[in-house]
């Protein structure tokens, strides 16, 4: 279950980090195609840790999407970034993709399309939960 304490709308800043351009940029394209307006990708293999931290620091009240492949494939980088977020970016909400974020008919390992769709599923679920709390 996602716990979001800030307002989450289709205008909330969403950042996704990844190492494969198709997955990382594909999430951005799919989210934008579904009405999310402030979406960006961080390609960890082409962006320095300092640049990533600067982007996080300058993005309060944002959603940071982290795929399972990032946690498994880049454990030192992710440990460093998650520690940085905890200490320096208290209003950045981190969501690590889990199996429940995928459609039920997803094949394993998931295809690029299925990985990208998981990001949309996450954002739509948070949006729905945020809407259910509004009076």
Walk through the language-model features, giving the residues of each.
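A short, well-structured beta->alpha microelement
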Residues: 37-59, 122
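Short, charged N-terminal beta->alpha structural module
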Residues: 4-42
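Conserved phosphotransfer microenvironments
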Residues: 63-84
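Eukaryotic N-terminal low-complexity, Ser/Thr- and Lys/Arg-rich leader segments
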Residues: 1-13, 125-135
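Ser/Thr/Gly-rich flexible loops in soluble cytosolic domains mediating phosphotransfer, phosphorylation
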Residues: 82-132
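Proline-aspartate-enriched helix->loop->beta-strand connector
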Residues: 60-61, 90
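Structural motif
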Residues: 13, 62-63
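Gly/Ser/Thr-rich loops at beta-strand to alpha-helix junctions
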Residues: 18-23, 70-74, 100-101
């Amino acid at each position: 279950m996602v716990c979001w304490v800030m307002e989450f709308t289709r205008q909330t800043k969403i950042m996704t980090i990844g190492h494969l351009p198709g997955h990382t940029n594909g999430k951005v394209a799919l989210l934008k195609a579904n009405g999310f307006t402030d979406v960006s990708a961080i390609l960890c293999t082409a962006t320095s840790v300092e640049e990533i931290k600067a982007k996080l620091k300058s993005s309060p009240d944002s959603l940071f999407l982290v795929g399972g492949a990032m946690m498994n494939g880049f454990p030192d980088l992710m440990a460093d970034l998650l520690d940085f977020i905890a200490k320096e970016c208290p209003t950045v909400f981190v969501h690590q993709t889990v199996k429940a974020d995928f459609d039920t008919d997803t094949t394993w390992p998931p295809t690029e399309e299925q990985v990208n769709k998981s990001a949309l599923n996450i954002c739509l679920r948070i949006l729905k939960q945020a809407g259910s709390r509004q009076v």
